[in-house]
Amino acid sequence: IQFEMALMDENGNILEEPGVIRHKVSFSNYDCEKFLSEDASNSKYAEYAQNLKRYINLYVYRFTDDNILGISDMAVMPKNYALNGLVSTNAANSITKTDYPFGCCINNKYIYETENDGYYNPYFIAITLGHELGHYIGLLHSFSENGCDDNDYCEDTHSCDYTSYTKNLKLQFDSLSVKYGGDKYITLDQISTREGCDGIQYVADNIMDYVYCLSDTITGDQRTRFNHVLHYGSLIPGPKLVDISSLSSRATSEVFTPQISNCPSIK
């Protein structure tokens, strides 16, 4: 899959900056979950969106919670092409806009973060963007935040209790601080090691896992899943394996609630 910066807006006007449309807003920061919700106060921001069947809309602004890097709407599927874990409705079959912002949001506090001179940087914007776009095209977290619910519908991804992992990681950091006065380096493989729900340790490397992680792979099941979304998703740009006019003829008017990815805070 290849993402390209748009050269023109939906009306055919050439953009001064490829992929960028700037808007002056009245807020200095905004609750990211509220921004993507159906809250009536968001309708004015929905007007900023470009045609959802031709563009992926990325909203870049300062979040009220500095510990959240990004957030995203999940893909919406027509009922005839439903996919486990995603909203299934014919209400989006023919629409090109919603009454509220729909897309991915990135916390602009971190938009200039890089790989940090060869050292791992959990705020690296490229990883955040890749993770959120994964949500937008239908991928779920490969971990469970509490307990061991393997709920990403991909049998070939590792799963762990992320809350347990972060608690153990803090103990590991505290132990290093006591032994070495905080000057001891730890490798990325070491801090990315989790104990899976099957009791087997592994080094996390999946883009849909979370800090700390190599974040450079997807699995076959994940590829199958996002290919299904790309080929049939209601609000996803690109060529489809279904007659669009046929989908539009089945469009319904029921209201559907957006499904938002909830990524853990980084603290």
Language model: regions and residue ranges:
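Acidic helix-start/capping segments at beta-turn-to-alpha-helix junctions
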Residues: I1-G19
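Extracellular (secreted or membrane-anchored) zinc-dependent metallopeptidases
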Residues: I1-L7, V25-E132, Y136-I266
